[in-house]
């Protein structure tokens, strides 16, 4: 009887391990996000990676101006940045560079004139 229970437990655990991750990440995608890239494409070079699995431990495969590259990941807060419907008349400097620069739940979001800390919208 005890062997039967152990076998049932093993089968259940094996099945659960095959379920997709609840986090919504794609298979092989590492946690965290990519830092923003503001640079223009100065030199077109081949992609250095196609996905996170090709990057060392804490690095992610991130899009740059005109190619993909393994770079250190940054922490990303929950929610999405709101869409900015405005047009910029006078560009300003960025008020943040990544989510960790923003207080509380605010995210560092692109706006018409630069990056700024904004309240996220629910996904």
UniProtKB/Swiss-Prot annotation:
Source species, domain of life: Eukaryota
Signal peptide (from-to): 1-24
Domain WAP: start-end pairs: 27-74, 75-121
Gene3D superfamilies, per the entry: Elafin-like
Keyword Acetylation attributed: no
PANTHER family: WAP FOUR-DISULFIDE CORE DOMAIN PROTEIN 8
Name of the protein in question: WAP four-disulfide core domain protein 5
Source organism per UniProt: Otolemur garnettii
Gene designation: WFDC5
């Amino acid at each position: 009887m005890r062997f039967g229970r152990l076998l049932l437990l093993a089968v259940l655990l094996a099945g659960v391990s095959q379920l997709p991750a609840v986090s919504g990440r794609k298979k092989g995608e590492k946690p965290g996000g990519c830092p923003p890239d503001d640079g223009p494409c100065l030199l077109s070079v081949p992609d250095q990676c196609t996905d996170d699995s090709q990057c060392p431990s804490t690095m992610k495969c991130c899009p740059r101006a005109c190619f993909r590259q393994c770079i250190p990941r940054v922490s990303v807060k929950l929610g999405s940045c709101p869409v900015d419907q405005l047009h910029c008349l006078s560009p300003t400097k960025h008020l943040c560079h990544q989510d960790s620069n923003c207080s509380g739940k605010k995210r560092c979001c692109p706006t018409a004139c630069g990056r700024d800390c904004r309240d996220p919208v629910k996904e």
